[in-house]
From Swiss-Prot:
Keyword Acyltransferase: no
Transmembrane segments: 1-21
Superkingdom of source: Bacteria
Chief subcellular location: membrane
Name of the encoding gene: tatA
Keyword Magnesium: no
Functional note: Part of the twin-arginine translocation (Tat) system that transports large folded proteins containing a characteristic twin-arginine motif in their signal peptide across membranes. TatA could form the protein-conducting channel of the Tat system.
Keywords carried by this UniProt record: Cell inner membrane, Cell membrane, Membrane, Protein transport, Translocation, Transmembrane, Transmembrane helix, Transport
UniProt protein name: Sec-independent protein translocase protein TatA
Family matches, as NCBIfam families: PRK00720.1 (NF001940), tatAE (TIGR01411)
A Pfam entry, by short name: TatA_B_E
Family assignment from sequence similarity: Belongs to the TatA/E family.
Amino acid sequence: MGSFSIWHWMIVLVIVLLVFGRGKIPELMGDMAKGIKSFKKGMADDDVADDKRTVEHRADETVSAVKEKASKS
């Protein structure tokens, strides 16, 4: 009773086809694929930008730490 049979899924499929039509479903799937691709590209771009900022920040900290030690001596 808690699980869906094949007939439940067939009825859902028929209702979806009636609501959206045959031409609209591929268009929606294409738009969803473009959105996922754009999201992945954005995440990859953020990772590269974050890596560059982290490396530059650590280099600055090292230089300032060395200068402070040199000025104290």
